[in-house]
Amino acid sequence: MSEPVRVAFLVEQCWHTVPGGTAVAAVGLAAALADLPGVSVTGIAARHARPPAVGPTPPVPVAHSRLPRPALYEAWHRTGRPRVENIGDHPGADGGLSLVHASGGAVPATRLPLVATIHDLGWRHEPGHSTRRGRRLFEAWLEDARRAAHVTCPSQATRADLLVAGFEPDRVSFIPLGSDPVGVDPSASAALRSHYGIDGPFVLWVGTTEPRKNLVRLVSAMEQIPDVPLVLVGPTGWKEDAARVTAPLGERVRVVGRVDEATKHAWYAAADVFAMPSLLEGFGLPVLEAMGHATPVVTSAGTATAEVVGDAGLTVDPTDADAIAGAITGLLADPDEAARLGRTGRDRSTTMTWSAAATATADVYRQVLAT
């Protein structure tokens, strides 16, 4: 029988001001890892007096550093301290930790074997889609990840970028993210439609409002589709004001903002089409989540989201508003085809679960510990 694997797993993303998909991914993977036999997970985070205000709650016990996030991230990068083994009250205090998993973003300091997850290298493709400070931070984290024994990434697109960046192929594993089925009472979706005054077909978008999400072109596409509302669900990120971007649609747009998980899934179940024509994603969890509700998807060709949807949705050039409009219009005009794609998407979504991601990740842990 193999030795149990005791993992220190970064969950600081849950406390970020805009937690985003990396926090959802960290929580989903940590929970599924903790459910595996022979694996125990302790979260690692900066100093916090309270649980996350807006992000998901870590599903595992958390050891907190004495340092606040900015100081902790800076210390890890510049001084290699404090080591994870010396943070808080966890098995590492008595030498019980097996390895450390940097689950996205900052890379903790440690002398233990290290696994790092890198979601994307988007700032290298589109520097203008990140702040100058953000680009410096992302580059620092990428350099810190080079000391990892192994790197995981959620898409073949990101893996290709990592190889171009100089990571060795045999040290980089593609492990898709996951999404587990979420039941929605039809009355919850009906209540959302009623509350927002939607009595016909509508298009849904979910994400953080920022330039790479390409809302400008989605709005341009929707201008070509009269009488169909566009619903935007998710928090404000940076450099893009949803109200300004969507102004051309007038009363046809519903800017919902940040919602809880149950409400988000009720929106997925209510939508007639889910559109996410991002210019770049590391994976695109909202696409997978929409597929899980049998909602037909329109997303971007040549990107990680196209990998997620496969042949279970429509992919278009994200820089072509006419193509985006054509795909959405086609689905709204052909309910049978929309339903077929929805069913195909739901079936495909069952192959990408957090359990599957955790099993593949645990295999990486054991591979690292065996070398």
Model-derived features: where do they sit?
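Carbohydrate transferase catalytic cores enriched for Leloir-type hexosyltransferases
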Residues: 1-371
